[in-house]
């Protein structure tokens, strides 16, 4: 079964693999400079999305600054899908002092404000919390990526499917 997801001009699950470039910096200024660099790049048209890595930011959990930063990145790169990610240390994220509840609250804020097109939620962050965020995301039009980073092994396909918290509906063709 093939499932498509359309965000802005980008159709995920259709055509070619998508190119996502991370925005990684400690400050809002560093992130904005990287977004400007992408915009000015001759290869900018090949980039489908940018991933703002919140686990590197020193500004968190200052929601006001985060909201302005996400809005500025979206303004600089209006054609790019904006993915927001806070990766926990256990799954390869930067070693900042974010507890699982803090990561949940930050992700929930971004989803409720719809300041990003997509938010990455770690599969094992808690089923109840993940389901709650997925429900809010559907209401707000924010797409969710459920991720799991196992650095020891790659599970077989049936295990990956069984880990899913979401029952995927019938496939759809992109518009």
Model-derived regions: residue spans:
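A structural micro-motif
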Residues: 17, 80-81, 142
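Active-site beta->alpha loop and helix N-cap motifs at the rims of alpha/beta catalytic domains
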Residues: 21-41, 47-132, 152
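Solvent-exposed alpha-helices and their adjacent loops that cap or buttress functional pockets
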Residues: 11-14, 111-113, 165
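A generic structural motif
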Residues: 53-54, 146-150, 173
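Single conserved hydrophobic/aromatic residue that forms the stacking wall/gate
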Residues: 166-175
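Redox- and metal-dependent alpha/beta enzyme cores, enriched for Fe-S-associated oxidoreductases
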Residues: 127-140, 146-165
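N-terminal amphipathic alpha-helix/helix-capping segment at the start of soluble metabolic enzymes
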Residues: 1-31
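Surface-exposed amphipathic alpha-helices with a cationic face
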Residues: 9-13, 70-77, 133-141
């Amino acid at each position: 079964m093939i499932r498509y997801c359309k965000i802005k001009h980008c159709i995920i699950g259709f055509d070619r693999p998508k190119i996502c470039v991370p925005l990684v910096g400690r400050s809002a200024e560093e992130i904005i400079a990287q977004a400007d660099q992408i915009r000015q790049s001759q290869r900018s048209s090949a980039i489908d999305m940018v991933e703002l890595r919140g686990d590197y930011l020193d500004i968190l959990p200052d929601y006001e600054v985060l909201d302005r930063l996400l809005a500025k990145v979206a303004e600089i790169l209006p054609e790019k899908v904006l993915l927001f990610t806070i990766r926990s240390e256990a799954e390869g994220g930067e070693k900042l002092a974010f507890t699982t509840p803090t990561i949940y609250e930050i992700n929930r804020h971004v989803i409720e404000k719809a300041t990003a097109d997509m938010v990455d939620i770690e599969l094992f962050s808690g089923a109840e919390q993940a389901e709650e965020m997925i429900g809010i995301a559907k209401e707000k039009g924010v797409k969710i990526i459920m991720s799991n980073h196992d650095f020891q092994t790659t599970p077989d396909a049936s295990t990956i499917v069984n880990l899913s918290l979401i029952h995927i509906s019938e496939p759809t063709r992109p518009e």
